[in-house]
Curated annotation (Swiss-Prot):
InterPro entries: PS_antenna-like, PS_II_antenna-like_sf, PSII_PsbC, PSII_PsbC_sf. It is a multi-pass membrane protein. The keyword Transmembrane applies. Binds multiple chlorophylls and provides some of the ligands for the Ca-4Mn-5O cluster of the oxygen-evolving complex. It may also provide a ligand for a Cl- that is required for oxygen evolution. PSII binds additional chlorophylls, carotenoids and specific lipids. [CaMn4O5] cluster binds at residue 367. Gene3D superfamilies: photosystem ii from thermosynechococcus elongatus. It comes from the Eukaryota. Keywords: Acetylation, Chlorophyll, Chloroplast, Chromophore, Manganese, Membrane, Metal-binding, Phosphoprotein, Photosynthesis, Photosystem II, Plastid, Thylakoid, Transmembrane, Transmembrane helix. GO terms for biological process: photosynthetic electron transport in photosystem II. Its main location: plastid. This is Photosystem II CP43 reaction center protein.
């Protein structure tokens, strides 16, 4: 246990794949890292590492801009977004650009502007990345001490952390300002089937906002994923932005406490592992959010959630059979339970049949038909609006269940249908990315801790078995 508090672990430790510590050049012989170790060659070259990061940002923004324009070029306003394989335009529509009542797209010009702005930004980032990778100083410490750093300088590292937190807080406030002052955002709960509106009274009560964090993640509780109104959503961003900005100022002004210095490993690879761990958590949360939440990810743009499509199917057939004369309140199904309606474990009236498992779904097309005890039988008989029928029929046939090489996977679809919901894409991609980032977190954390403890020398490539094998001929 003594090594845990040994001063050795505070020295600049990096785990090499090859056994030399001279880091002047960028080839395998001088850095100890082969080409496939990526930016590890640049660990101690802050100027070149800046070039790599700015170039990476340029590639990301270039993808965003070009994919945005690609989706605009292929967009058909008459079809729902979720039928067209779009993954970027739904985000822009959710922010209230180009959308009219009921989620109808009335103007695609804002989407075009977004794509062009991202392309222009990517050109600037690309130029900066190439400049710093090829022309700019190898290290920033001498010429630009404010931007220079050494990995073991804990005060500088927490200052950089603080700057990042302030930028994240500013990003959260951008959404708050858009919702409050700059045209508002799309609210799927607006009466009559959704509309863009300004958020006038955002929720600032800490009891409500932090109550979400204290909820169980299971069942009808749903942790923060259960947020079902824009007031709470924007209020949460206000709180989060404030906390990030104040936390950022704190980290810039203070030095790490003694317990922090002892608890953490202070090396480039350790910071990489912390970042990957955080991104992994973000990925898993985003996966659950896009899969279950139809407020932050409106079904008008992303397609229905799984429970929503299932409940929509029950609702559609209830409407049909009621028109044909069925008594939906008393009809029995094959199991003796109610065919169309039954009671939940807590006594509410819910849809019967297989969709009973999704009885606590909340959706804007269904909520107007509820009373104090669940679904209201008189409302189901007299108050169903045409837009509710249309929307549920649409959602019933677009469940987020299809696979790439199969039909949609719901009994109501004909064999020719091959539909993959953007909800499926976004949820599965974020789950997979979250998982891989978690593996990366474990890998780099293990290497960083081993290097700090002083018993990991890297992989000795000189004794690699393949070097002693007869060449394949």
């Amino acid at each position: 246990m003594k090594t845990l508090y040994s001063p050795r672990r505070f020295y600049p430790v990096e785990t090499l794949f090859n056994g030399t510590l001279t880091l002047a050049g960028r080839d395998q012989e001088t850095t100890g890292f082969a080409w496939w170790a990526g930016n590890a060659r640049l660990i101690n070259l802050s100027g070149k590492l800046l070039g790599a990061h700015v170039s990476h940002a340029g590639l990301i923004v270039f993808w965003a801009g070009s994919m945005n324009l690609f989706e605009v070029a292929h967009f058909i306003p008459e079809k729902p977004m979720y039928e067209q394989g779009l993954i970027l335009l739904p985000h822009l529509a959710t922010l209230g650009w180009g959308v009219g009542p009921g989620g109808e797209i009335v103007d695609t010009f804002p989407y075009f502007v977004s794509g062009v702005l991202h392309l222009i930004s990517s050109a600037v980032l690309g130029f900066g990345g190439i400049y710093h990778a090829l022309i700019g100083p190898e290290t920033l410490e001498e010429s630009f001490p404010f931007f220079g750093y050494t990995w073991k300088d804990r005060n500088k590292m927490t200052t950089i952390l603080g700057i990042h937190l302030i930028l994240l807080g500013a990003g959260a406030f951008l959404l708050v300002f858009k919702a409050l002052f700059f045209g508002g955002i799309y609210d799927t709960w607006a009466p009559g089937g959704g509309d863009v509106r300004k958020i006038t009274n955002l929720t600032l009560s800490p009891n409500i906002i932090f109550g979400y964090l204290l909820k169980s993640p299971f069942g009808g509780e749903g942790w923060i994923v259960s947020v079902d109104n824009l007031e709470d959503l924007i209020g949460g961003h206000f709180w989060l932005g404030s906390i990030c900005i104040f936390g950022g100022i704190w980290h810039i002004l203070t030095k790490p406490f003694a317990w922090t210095r002892r608890a953490f490993v202070w090396s480039g690879e350790a910071y990489l592992s912390y970042s990957l761990g955080a991104l992994s958590v973000f990925g898993f949360i985003a996966c659950c959010f896009v899969w279950f939440n139809n407020t932050a990810y409106p079904s008008e743009f992303y397609g229905p959630t799984g429970p929503e499509a299932s409940q929509a199917q029950a609702f559609t057939f209830l409407v049909r059979d009621q028109r044909l004369g069925a008594s939906v309140g008393s009809a029995q199904g094959p199991t003796g339970l109610g065919k169309y309606l039954m009671r939940s474990p807590t006594g509410e009236i819910i849809f019967g049949g297989e969709t009973m498992r999704f009885w606590d779904l909340r959706a804007p097309w269904l909520e107007p038909l509820r009373g104090p005890n669940g679904l209201d039988l008189s409302k189901l008989k007299k108050d169903i609006q045409p837009w509710q029928e249309r929307r549920s029929a649409e959602y019933m046939t677009h469940a987020p269940l299809g696979s790439l090489n199969s039909v949609g996977g719901v009994a109501t679809e004909i064999n020719a249908v091959n539909f993959v919901s953007p909800r499926s894409w976004l949820a599965t991609s974020h789950f997979v990315l979250g998982f891989f980032f978690f593996v990366g977190h474990l890998w780099h954390a293990g290497r960083a801790r081993a290097a700090a403890a002083g018993f990991e020398k890297g992989i000795d490539r000189d004794l690699e078995p393949v070097l002693f094998m007869t060449p394949l001929n």
